[in-house]
Amino acid sequence: MTYDIAIVGGGIVGLATGRELLQRHPGLKLLIREKDDILAKQQTGHNSGVIHSGIYYKPGSLKAKLCVEGRKALWEYCDAKQIAYKNVGKLIVATEERELPNLDDLYQRGIANGIDGLEILDAAGIAEREPHCRGIKAIFSPVTGIIDYGLVARSYADDVVAMGGTIETNCEVTGIDGVGGKSIVHSNRGDVEASHVITCGGLQSDRLAQMTGGKSDPKIVPFRGDYLILKPEKRYLVKGNIYPVPDPAFPFLGVHFTPRMNGDVWLGPNAVLAFAREGYSFTTINPRDLVETLTYPGFIKLAGKFLSTGLGEMYRDVNRAAYVQSLQRYIPELTVDDTLTGPSGVRAQAMMSDGSMVDDFVFDGDAGVVHVRNAPSPAATSSLAIGRFIADDADRRFDLARSSATAVS
């Protein structure tokens, strides 16, 4: 069968994109091919479940724009679909004087990004919001929430199927070839022909882009993040999201406290190099993935720049007492005995060959293909807005309005 559009990747971004395209173009022959046995298994399935406000991102960036738009769209969607979420809020807490300039800059960034209801709290205000948290100054964001993104992704998939789209799982794409103005999408389940292709491959995004002659940069370097979980009898220590003041030189937000929809409280994550793109444990090693990372010039330069930080993260990864000590900056009464081993996730960190880490969403392509090259956090929060952004791009590149009109006539 020939499809109008084949989407490679059945995570939350690929599903949101398929949903948006079918809404705009009823009757569009659309296929989503997902390599795993279930949809949204990788980054979406290991997501911490935070609905981000948009405070962290550079004003004018795609992350800032799409996160704010996507959060509001997500609320509306979940209300309409009766998907539960909670706006539990977030504290971004400074515990030392040296963090105050970055905290103040973050507040101004939030104002510039149009985040509603931001408050500056002193130590007493922090204690009022989070009685067990200690800090000297904090930002409170009332529009930060929590949700189960697996439920959201499955709902998007239901929408795709209801509008006539096709979804294939256990379908690993192995190549994409251009033939006669169309694309042949090869997989372990056979080949299909598509007029246009959109890749939303997450941890495999660079490899998918290179299948169609895309640039080698940005390269995906996988970083694993391990969580601890508060024991049920200690959940009273945390009411909402508690985050540190991020280091602007480092792309990760630092260890934090995250309530979950099921009542759990996650602590973390750390950030250590994963030895496989889907390596959710220290012992999972994929030789191809590891060799690609260790020989990539960008990673070599990054490792030299952040050697001490990386060693500290690795030490905390194998020493729970050190891990908990980093959390005690915010909740001093927390102890190792209050924690259980939690899940892990892998972040697809896009990197350039000069060692710089890509800090914004990145999309590229040509007349027949659109690639999502970098869509880390807050992609889940932003998913509906990202879907609209990609659909806009596809409409321009693929002239879908004319194609749809021709199909109808």
Name what the model sees in each region.
Residues 1-13, 31:
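Beta1/beta-strand and adjacent pyrophosphate-binding region of the FAD-binding site
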Residues 297-405:
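C-terminal catalytic lobe of FAD-dependent flavoproteins
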Residues 84-94, 117-120, 125-164, 182-188, ...:
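Helix-loop-beta segment of a Rossmann-like dinucleotide-binding subdomain
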Residues 139-196, 207, 384-395:
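Helical element adjacent to the flavin cofactor pocket in flavoenzyme catalytic cores
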Residues 22-45:
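Glycine-rich FAD pyrophosphate-binding loop
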Residues 49-125, 135, 254-255, 264-266, ...:
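Dinucleotide-binding Rossmann-like beta1-alpha1 core, especially the glycine-rich loop
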Residues 16, 176-285:
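Flavin-dependent oxidoreductases
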Residues 112, 215-217, 234-235, 260-344:
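Flavin-binding catalytic cores
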